[in-house]
């Protein structure tokens, strides 16, 4: 390997890069081409028009494909298997036969990887003063560098708070394996053979074929690489099967992932150091993950406390157990350590406890009580082990966030006066307004109410915000009213596990999309004092409750979800001097570069810089199950990709099941939570999708007082109408139960096909228009083949038949 290179300063990123002085020379002595080394530092970007211009190969892939994979968007949800993506040439690319990794451990700027608790890993040559290292971000939380330990180019870092947005990459590859053993352990099927294939995500200098963007460390432009690993020399080739995204300036420190066939999970291999290249080939090389280095730093920041069921007192200097006093330790760099408790017991604060960058860690399967009259705690957070309960009876410090991790339970018994950020386990709110605001992340955490006013009743969102993958709010028998639920995706779940029924009331005064789900013993209400066209409640998550939904003087719209995708930029390009000195308008350039492929494939949505589009083909089906939907002076629609099961009772209302009904998208879908996690935004758009998609309804509908029902998609069930109208255009409508139409009309038209299996009674009017079918059949008898029970269809006003193709 050529090790002759010069270090050059890059003013763009304030750092040094390694540039080979022999990159194009050939050794006459050996006849072998020498390899050049390029260190893609978190401090480097420039040397390298070569590095950025040849980054993402977009000749046959869309730019968005690389971003979607990195950010687990589109088809690339964590755990998705058998993923295929369309190509610009009209073909299809099949990803390896393995689940898609969860890339949540990757920080927003891509240079670091969370490994659990308050730790992350990167490359040693990434300077600690660089913004991507000094401040590391997951979700809407900033974590600050405290200390680190290195081995070679591998570095493990201590942060100032426990990371709540991800469990982290907690397992690593075994480097003691032979090449054959490694192939068996980490090999996956791809292109007909078993290979060691993995993935990496970074936010280095973004570029596409023949075009450099000029952006580094942009969270929106995090992109993924797929590599093939040579176990013998530990080089990784990124040119794998056509999905080619080369490493570039700013990618250093990003993590490499392999699938462990033994553990059935993705593990971290190491962190990117740089790349080597000859005139023909390029390989990435990395620093191996080193558990010993990780353990050294963790031990440095841990003070063991064996409580073993006893009572302990603590202040900012000492711990006392049975009159034995132990000093609270600091690291050599004068930083606070985590206090790690074992054996359960009681902990009393005799003074306000400020642990600084240290936290409190509680072991598994124990019970602890933390007390201290009018005393407060501040620190890196609390981590509670599985099956452990911590009774928390001390306050928090104002203007601080309490970070809670671990699978155990935190019982909050006094109002904290600060904010909570939680990502795992359960937080039980037993105090009135237990926290000023609550941020729920990762999908692994539950916030459970212990009283009706545990949340902030003066906040439109009740002071609780669900970021990416959300989490669960358990009403626990306490009814709650929201103007809007601050949820960004379907990972948010509002449930009620109590035997006591709770009502979830949504009183949004303006059009609003709830992206999450509602489950459990929960009634749902959306009502107003007078009818308003503005208070439309749109749900594109799921409902699964055995209870009722009540809608009064409003609109309820149930629909599937337009799959959310990565975007390139939020808002207009940044201008230092408006109209004179501006960043490159790469969003417009991306659209230009892919315009020909988009015209050919009718795929403008691929490059329109929107999280979702009406004309995109990928919509996720949502399921809505309930006991009875009660509609009064309201409008109800089901749109594409919705499956609805439950009875409906409608009074003076309009119901449209499928067909040409509006659908809604949220231009901030997936990125609704703002600021430091305690803000919410939406931009709801109404339109028509390119395809109506499929929707279905199963249940009995009762219409009263001038209601109208339009059946435009699959329908199975019964109808009872009083002084109302029913129109059928669906080609697949089955009256499985008796149809009763009292002083009501039934019209089948526009290609409709209605089968009445148990007979019908119509006492107003029955109209069949051209190209429709209205079979009158008996009812199949259970347990008897080809046996049908006779039924009676009775129409007092006769038939109105129009057209010559009626059947």
What is each residue range found by the language model?
Residues 337, 341-412, 451-541, 608-628, ...:
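Extracellular, surface-exposed repeat architectures
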Residues 54-86, 108-126, 218-241, 245-318:
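C-terminal subregion of chymotrypsin/trypsin-like serine protease catalytic domains
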Residues 116-117, 121-152, 162-166:
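Catalytic-histidine neighborhood of serine endopeptidases
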Residues 4-31, 41-48, 53, 247, ...:
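Solvent-exposed adhesion/ligand-recognition segments of exported proteins
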Residues 128-140, 195-203, 258:
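Short conserved beta-strand and strand-loop elements enriched in small hydrophobics
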Residues 23-24, 125-128, 160-165, 203-207, ...:
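Acidic glycine-/aspartate-rich tracts in secreted/extracellular proteins
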């Amino acid at each position: 390997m050529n090790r002759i290179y010069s270090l050059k300063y890059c003013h763009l990123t304030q750092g040094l890069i390694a540039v080979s002085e022999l990159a194009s020379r050939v050794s006459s002595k050996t006849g072998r081409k020498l390899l050049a080394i390029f260190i893609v530092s978190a401090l480097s970007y420039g040397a390298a028009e070569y590095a950025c211009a040849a980054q993402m190969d977009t000749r046959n892939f869309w730019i968005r494909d690389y971003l979607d994979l990195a950010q687990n968007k589109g088809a690339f949800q964590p755990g998705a298997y058998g993923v295929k993506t369309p190509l610009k040439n009209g073909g299809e690319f099949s990803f390896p036969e393995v689940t898609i990794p969860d890339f949540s451990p990757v920080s927003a700027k891509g240079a670091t990887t969370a490994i659990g608790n308050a730790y992350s890993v990167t490359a040693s040559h990434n300077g600690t003063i660089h913004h991507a290292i000094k401040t590391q971000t997951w979700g809407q939380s900033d974590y600050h560098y405290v200390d680190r330990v290195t081995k070679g180019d591998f570095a493990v870092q201590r942060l100032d708070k426990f990371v709540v947005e991800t469990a982290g990459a907690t397992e690593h590859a075994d480097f003691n394996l032979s090449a054959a053993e490694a192939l068996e352990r980490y090999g996956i099927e791809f292109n007909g053979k078993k290979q060691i294939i993995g993935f990496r995500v970074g936010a280095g200098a973004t570029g596409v074929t023949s075009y450099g963007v000029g952006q580094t460390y942009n969270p929106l432009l995090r992109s993924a690489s797929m590599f093939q690993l040579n176990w013998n020399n530990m080089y990784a080739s990124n040119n794998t099967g056509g999905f080619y995204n080369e490493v570039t300036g700013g990618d250093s420190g990003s993590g490499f992932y392999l699938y462990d066939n033994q553990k059935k999970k993705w593990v971290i291999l190491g962190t990117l150091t740089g790349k080597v290249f000859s005139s023909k080939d390029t390989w990435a090389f990395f620093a191996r993950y080193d558990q010993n280095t990780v353990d050294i730093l963790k031990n440095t920041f841990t003070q063991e406390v064996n409580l073993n069921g006893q009572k302990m007192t603590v202040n900012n200097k000492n711990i006392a157990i049975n009159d034995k006093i132990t000093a609270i330790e600091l690291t050599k760099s004068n930083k606070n350590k985590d206090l790690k408790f074992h054996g359960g017991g009681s902990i009393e604060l005799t003074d306000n406890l400020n642990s600084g960058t240290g936290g409190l860690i509680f072991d598994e399967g124990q019970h602890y009580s933390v007390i201290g009259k009018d005393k407060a705690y501040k620190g890196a957070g609390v981590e509670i082990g599985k099956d452990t309960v911590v009774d928390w009876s001390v306050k928090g410090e104002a203007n601080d966030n309490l970070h809670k991790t671990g699978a155990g339970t935190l019982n909050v018994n006094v109002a904290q006066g600060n904010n909570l950020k939680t990502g795992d386990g359960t937080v039980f709110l037993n105090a009135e307004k237990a926290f000023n605001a609550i941020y729920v992340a990762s999908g692994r955490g539950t916030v459970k109410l212990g009283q009706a006013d545990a949340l902030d009743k003066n906040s439109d969102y009740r002071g609780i915000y669900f970021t990416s993958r959300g989490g669960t709010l358990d009403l626990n028998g306490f009814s709650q009213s929201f103007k809007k639920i601050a949820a960004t995706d379907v990972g948010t779940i509002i449930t009620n596990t109590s035997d006591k029924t709770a009502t979830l009331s949504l009183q949004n005064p303006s059009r609003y999309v709830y992206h999450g789900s509602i489950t459990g013993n929960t009634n749902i209400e959306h009502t107003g004092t007078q009818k308003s066209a503005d208070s439309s409640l749109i749900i594109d998550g799921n409902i699964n409750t055995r209870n009722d939904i009540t809608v009064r003087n409003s609109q309820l719209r149930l629909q599937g979800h337009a799959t959310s995708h990565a975007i390139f930029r939020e808002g207009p390009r940044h201008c230092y001097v408006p109209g004179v000195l501006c960043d490159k308008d790469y969003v417009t350039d991306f659209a230009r570069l892919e315009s020909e492929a988009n015209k050919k494939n009718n795929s403008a949505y691929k490059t329109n810089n929107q999280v979702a589009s009406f004309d995109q083909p990928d919509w996720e089906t949502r399921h809505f199950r309930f006991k009875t939907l009660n509609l009064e002076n309201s409008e109800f629609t089901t749109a594409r990709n919705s499956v609805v099961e439950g009875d409906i009772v409608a009074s003076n209302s309009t119901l449209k099941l499928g067909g040409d009904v509006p659908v809604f998208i949220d231009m901030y879908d997936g990125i609704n939570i703002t600021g430091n996690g305690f803000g919410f935004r939406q931009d709801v758009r109404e339109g028509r999708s390119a395809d109506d998609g499929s929707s279905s309804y199963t249940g009995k509908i009762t219409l009263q007082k001038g209601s109208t029902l339009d059946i435009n998609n699959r329908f199975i069930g019964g109808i009872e109408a009083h002084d109302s109208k029913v129109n059928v255009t669906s080609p697949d409508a089955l009256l499985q139960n008796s149809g009763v139409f009292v002083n009501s009309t039934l019209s089948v038209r526009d290609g409709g096909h209605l089968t009445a299996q148990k007979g019908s009674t119509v006492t107003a009017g029955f109209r069949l228009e051209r190209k429709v079918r209205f079979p009158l059949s008996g009812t199949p008898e259970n347990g008897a083949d080809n046996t049908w029970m006779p039924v009676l269809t009775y129409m007092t006003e006769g038939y109105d038949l129009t057209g010559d193709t009626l059947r």
